[in-house]
Amino acid sequence: MNDADNDGSVVALVPAAGRGVRLGEKSPKAFVPVGGTPMVRLAVDGLLAAGVVDRIIVMVPAEWVESAVALLPPSEVVRVVVGGAERTDSVRAGLAAAPDAGYFLVHDAARALTPPALIGRIVGELRAGRRAVVPALPVVDTVKSVDAAGVVTGTPDRAALRAVQTPQGFTADLLRAAYAADVPATDDAGLVERLGEPVHTVAGDPLAFKITTPLDLRLAETLLDRRAAL
């Protein structure tokens, strides 16, 4: 499919099939509540609040489809499909469910507090002509590279490093091409980089942190409590 075949719509893909092992949960991480609301619901609410997303596709384990439909906002905009064993499998399922999309956002459900304004910045850059855009924050800690024995082998220049967040935005044809190449990468932007395509950055937001550990979960709950008190 090329750009002439799409309808120009922005479709957000939300992989939500990963397990909550590091959170000490048996359910998929996306279904773990933060302040009483599942992460995936918070993430979807943020995408809707941004006002720049036309459709949202949430990919969940087959046995969690009914639960996901029940907890997500009733809307023609939001659709739940079966995801895969790996994150890349889930994204592929999302791509297949939106054949007419013009742009894709791939957003971690675990980044449940991502501000709508950040989502708007990503879509704004895509609409302005960028083909791949990711939110990023400067790295504040010193980073060391180490060998297999844990011995330091180098210290990268921190000024050139960025911590990348989601949603990551792409033109539909570019993201489809990246997944068709079937090469290993730790995120969607990494797949695009393997094609030799430039990936642009916009200012990220500390609130778009990924809820991965019990400490992250406590922080997110505290932030939600403070938001509710305002």
From Swiss-Prot:
Keyword Aminoacyl-tRNA synthetase: no
CDD domains in the record: CDP-ME_synthetase
Catalysis performed (reactions): 2-C-methyl-D-erythritol 4-phosphate + CTP + H(+) = 4-CDP-2-C-methyl-D-erythritol + diphosphate
A Pfam short name: IspD
Documented EC number(s): 2.7.7.60
Family: Belongs to the IspD/TarI cytidylyltransferase family. IspD subfamily.
HAMAP family the record matches: IspD
Function noted in UniProt: Catalyzes the formation of 4-diphosphocytidyl-2-C-methyl-D-erythritol from CTP and 2-C-methyl-D-erythritol 4-phosphate (MEP).
NCBIfam families recorded: ispD
Protein name: 2-C-methyl-D-erythritol 4-phosphate cytidylyltransferase
Name of the encoding gene: ispD
